[in-house]
Regions:
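Acidic, His- and aromatic-enriched active-site or binding-groove loops in soluble protein domains
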Residues: 24-43, 84-89, 133
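Catalytic-core signal marking the mid-to-C-terminal active-site face
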Residues: 96-97, 103-104, 127-303
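Accessory "access/gating" subregions that flank catalytic or transport cores
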Residues: 45-48, 53-59, 75-80, 91, ...
């Protein structure tokens, strides 16, 4: 997998009080793709994009998202390492520019109850020579593309701990448009993974479960390993799930495996995972799991946990 796209980063902005501390009051109450004057973030998004361009990071698009004070900036494709670097820089730029404008930017997955959470949509494209493996052939995906998707679906439950690292992450799953089930579709936007059949050189797949609490280097590396695992083991891609998750029959949903629904469950999956044990150094995996267990204990005494806030 050689190229990853600017990750569909979603963030929320909150106003500060007179003591320069962030409040729970959103900067605006605009909706998806709203415009000024309802969308009060247009100038700030422009400032962020221009700052990124000065740092040789070129946004592809920006807009107001569904939630109050929620915004999204997408990047152009780059190689996986560069995409991870860009995300780290992007988060710092967003927080700095927001602070300069008297606002507090949070990447917390579920900062406002009963409103859309903020995810990190990771878009993957794979080049084989000069050809895009995910570009449709005769109206469908190539066998290699299908096996890569199958590899991700097979291993995504095990790697969820690395894609969603805080207790707050799991409050987003299954809420409103956020994924809960391990499923895929060509066009249904509610599924965990979407594989469009767009006849373009930049067609790729989109994983919708990750959030901005993840270490992007771990996330990218594990997703690449999952794709390779699918190809090597010739994993078979299950049938697409084209039903609306919210109105699907319970018998149909019962056939689907779910993502871990809590940090504790994600830790348990990771501890038992042969996939992670084979791909990560033993000391690194053990240390990461130990840190996450400490976070679970911390939650018993405070909510949200310090880790939730520090990664937001």
């Amino acid at each position: 997998v050689e190229r990853s796209r600017g990750l569909g980063d979603v963030y929320k902005r909150q106003e500060k009080d007179d003591t320069d501390m962030p409040t729970k009051r959103p900067h605006d109450y605009a909706g998806y793709c709203d415009a000024a004057p309802v969308d009060r973030g247009e100038n700030l998004r422009r400032d962020i994009c221009l700052t990124l361009e000065q740092m040789d990071i070129f946004p592809e698009s920006s807009r107001h998202e569904t939630g109050p004070g929620q915004n999204e900036i997408d990047f152009q494709y780059s190689n996986a390492l560069k995409a991870a670097d860009n995300l780290v820089t992007f988060k710092n730029v967003v927080k700095s520019v927001a602070d300069r404008n008297g606002l507090y930017a949070t990447f917390m997955p579920k900062p406002i109850v009963d409103n859309c959470g903020s995810g990190l949509h990771i878009m993957l494209m794979c080049m084989k020579g000069t050809e895009n493996v995910f570009r449709p052939q005769l109206g469908g995906l190539s066998k290699e593309a299908e096996r890569m998707i199958a590899g991700i679906l097979k291993n995504v439950g095990d790697m969820t701990l690395f894609l969603n690292t805080t207790t707050n992450s799991y409050k987003r799953f299954g809420s409103l448009l956020a994924p809960k089930y391990i499923s895929w579709s060509h066009e249904n936007y509610a599924q965990l993974l979407r594989a469009p059949l767009a006849d373009t050189d930049e067609n790729g797949i989109i994983l919708r479960s990750a959030d901005n609490t993840c270490n992007p280097y771990f996330a990218m590396g594990l997703l690449i390993y999952a794709c390779i695992d699918g190809v090597i083991n010739k994993e078979e891609l299950p049938k697409p799930f084209n039903f609306n998750i919210g109105s699907a029959d319970e018998n149909e949903l019962a056939k689907l495996e779910t993502l871990p629904q809590s940090l504790k469950e994600a830790v348990e999956r990771a501890e038992k995972s042969e996939f992670l044990a084979d791909r990560l150094p033993e000391h690194m995996l053990e240390r990461f799991i130990a840190i996450e267990k400490e976070l679970i204990i911390c939650l018993l005494y405070t909510s949200p946990s310090p880790r939730d806030l520090s990664t937001s």
